[in-house]
Regions:
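Long, acidic (Asp/Glu-rich), low-complexity accessory segments flanking structured domains
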Residues: 1-13, 76
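The start of beta-strands in P-loop NTPase/AAA+ ATPase cores
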Residues: 3, 27-31, 44, 98, ...
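Hydrophobic faces of well-ordered beta-strands that scaffold small-molecule active sites
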Residues: 5-7, 33-35, 100-102, 126-128, ...
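Short, motif-level signal for alpha-helix interfacial/capping segments enriched in acidic residues
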Residues: 11-28, 111
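Catalytic domains of carbohydrate-active enzymes, especially glycoside hydrolases
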Residues: 22-39, 169-177
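Glycine-rich, proline-tolerant flexible connector loops at the mouths of alpha/beta enzymes
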Residues: 39-52
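Metal-dependent phosphodiesterase/phospholipase catalytic core, i.e.
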Residues: 49-156, 172-182, 195
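C-terminal active-site rim and adjoining tail of enzyme catalytic domains
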Residues: 81, 152, 157-243
Length: 243
C-alpha cells in the first residue's frame, strides 16, 4: 500500500485552480481530484474556492450571483468555472477508480453535493472534508454512508481528547483526520494513529516535505492520502520509494 494522491484544486501548480483543465492534468498525472465547492444564487453547485472575487475594481460575492452571471465575468486568469456535475461528466470513464475530495463552503453546499453524488452513484468514490463538526454532523444526518473527513484547525499542535472532540468524531463514524504539513507533522501523524484514525496530509508541495511524508511509518501505518499542487513530482518520488 502507498498513500493516495489528490491533486489540490487539480494540478494547481500547473493549471488554473478548480478548472476542468487542472483536474484533467491531475488525473493524467495519476492523482485524484480535490476541489472546493459552493452554491450560486440560483443553487448551482460550482467548483470555486473563495466566497468572493475581484475583477478590476469590482467586488463580487459568489452566492449573490447566478451561474450565468458568474460565467459572463471576464476573470483575469480567463478561467471557466465548472459545475460539479460537469466535472463528473468529464471523468465518467475514470469513475471506477478515481477518487474525489471536496471542501465545502457551507453545509447546504454539502447537502447539494450529496444529492449529486447519489444521482451519479459515486458515494464510495467521494470524500467530503470540513473543519466544522456541526457541518459534518449535519451531513451525517443526511447520509449514513458518506465518507466524511475532519480537517483540523491549523493552530492545533496535539491530537488528544483535550484538543479535539474525538468521541464525537467516532460517534459520527469519521475515520480520517486531515492535517496540514507543518513542522510537527510527524508527531501529529503518530497521535492520529494512536487514537485509531487514518491520517491525510495537505499542503505537501516541496520535495523535502514530500519525502518526509512518504517516509512516515508508525505502528505499521502510513499516511493514507496526500494533497499536493504537483502530483507528478509526488508520484515520481513515491514510485522510487515504494518500488
Amino acid at each position: 500500500m502507498k498513500p493516495y494522491i489528490f491533486g489540490h484544486r487539480g494540478a494547481s501548480g500547473y493549471e488554473i485552480e478548480n478548472t476542468i483543465s487542472a483536474y484533467k492534468k491531475a488525473v493524467d498525472m495519476g492523482a485524484g481530484i480535490e476541489a472546493d465547492v459552493q452554491l450560486t444564487q440560483d443553487n448551482k453547485l460550482i467548483c470555486f474556492h473563495d466566497p468572493f472575487f475581484v475583477i478590476g475594481s469590482d467586488y463580487y460575492v459568489v452566492r449573490k450571483l447566478t451561474l450565468n452571471e458568474i460565467r459572463e465575468k471576464n476573470f483575469e486568469d480567463n478561467r471557466k468555472v465548472p459545475l460539479v456535475k460537469e466535472v463528473f461528466d468529464n471523468f465518467k470513464e475514470n469513475s471506477t477508480y478515481l477518487r474525489y475530495s471536496f471542501d465545502i463552503l457551507e453545509k447546504n453546499a454539502g447537502l447539494a453535493l450529496l444529492t449529486i453524488i447519489r444521482n451519479n452513484l459515486l458515494l464510495q468514490n467521494i470524500e467530503i472534508t470540513d473543519r466544522r463538526l456541526y457541518v459534518l454532523s449535519f451531513l451525517r444526518k443526511h447520509s449514513k454512508k458518506a465518507n466524511l473527513v475532519y480537517t483540523i484547525a491549523e493552530h492545533i499542535n496535539k491530537i488528544s481528547d483535550k484538543t479535539l472532540n474525538l468521541k464525537r468524531l467516532r460517534k459520527l463514524d469519521i475515520k480520517v483526520i486531515n492535517i496540514r504539513c507543518k513542522r510537527n507533522v510527524e508527531d501529529l501523524f503518530k497521535e492520529i494513529i494512536d487514537n485509531g484514525f487514518k491520517c491525510y496530509i495537505w499542503d505537501v508541495n516541496t520535495k523535502l516535505n514530500m519525502r518526509k511524508v512518504i517516509n512516515m511509518n508508525y505502528s505499521g501505518e502510513i499516511v493514507s492520502a496526500i494533497y499536493t499542487d504537483y502530483p507528478d513530482k509526488l508520484n515520481q518520488l513515491m514510485e522510487d520509494h515504494f518500488k
